[in-house]
């Protein structure tokens, strides 16, 4: 027997649209982001899951709300910030252009996409991976104990280590991933 995980990224936010470092700042879904959430909901409408996970950020919660409209069987919604977006620390709220202008493209790229280097007072992807792996360990226990399929409304950078784990990717492969706003990934857990 297999249990299923359906993981998806929240829809586009205003900070995403404006190319700002969002991180742990709360940025609402744009009209396109709402359409993204509806597309995910439509693509998942024939799947079954009894529990769903979200983070405390409205973009995760709001995307999940659209998905859950098709899933009356989902009785448990759990907020778990181990799947929250990467903290960009002092960069949060700043536009990419501003950071490039102030620190240069090379430093921007290091802070934006480096595995090992955190942004000032923020997290590296390596740090995000550590908390996501703890979440995965507990998630698998939860699923097996309760015999449930789950949906996870996540974030672009928390999905990277999640996908690395289930797709058995290298760090390099993980860092090249782009997670779409309007689709989901499905993984199986053997019980």
Feature-to-residue mapping (PLM):
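Active-site-adjacent alpha-helix immediately C-terminal to a catalytic or transition-state-stabilizing loop
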Residues: 2, 61, 133-191
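Short coil-to-beta-strand
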Residues: 2-12, 104-109
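Loop-to-helix element that buttresses phosphate recognition and phosphoryl-transfer chemistry
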Residues: 6, 12-62, 119-133, 176
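Short, solvent-exposed coil/turn elements at secondary-structure transition points
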Residues: 11, 58, 83-85, 114, ...
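Short, basic/glycine-rich phosphate-binding loops at helix/coil junctions
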Residues: 17-20, 105-119
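Phosphate-coordination/substrate-recognition cap region in phosphate-metabolizing enzymes
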Residues: 38-107, 166-169, 174-177
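Short, well-ordered beta-to-alpha junction loops that form the rim of enzyme active sites
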Residues: 55-57, 82, 113, 152-157
């Amino acid at each position: 027997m297999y249990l299923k995980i359906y993981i998806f990224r929240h829809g586009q936010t205003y900070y995403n649209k404006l190319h700002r470092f969002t991180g742990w700042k709360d940025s609402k879904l744009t009209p396109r982001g709402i359409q993204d959430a509806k597309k995910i909901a439509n693509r998942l409408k024939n799947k079954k899951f009894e529990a769903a996970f979200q983070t405390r950020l409205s973009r995760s919660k709001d995307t999940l709300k659209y998905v859950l409209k098709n899933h009356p069987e989902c009785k448990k919604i759990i907020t778990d910030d181990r799947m929250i977006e990467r903290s960009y620390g002092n960069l949060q709220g700043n536009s990419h252009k501003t950071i490039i202008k102030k620190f240069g493209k090379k430093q921007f790229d290091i802070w934006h996409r480096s595995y090992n280097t955190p942004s000032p007072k923020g997290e590296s992807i390596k740090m995000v991976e550590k908390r996501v792996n703890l979440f995965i360990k507990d998630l698998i226990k939860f699923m097996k104990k309760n015999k449930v399929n789950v949906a996870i409304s996540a974030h672009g950078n928390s999905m990277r280590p999640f996908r690395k784990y289930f797709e058995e990717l290298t760090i390099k492969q993980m860092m090249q991933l782009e997670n779409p706003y309007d689709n989901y990934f499905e993984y199986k857990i053997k019980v």
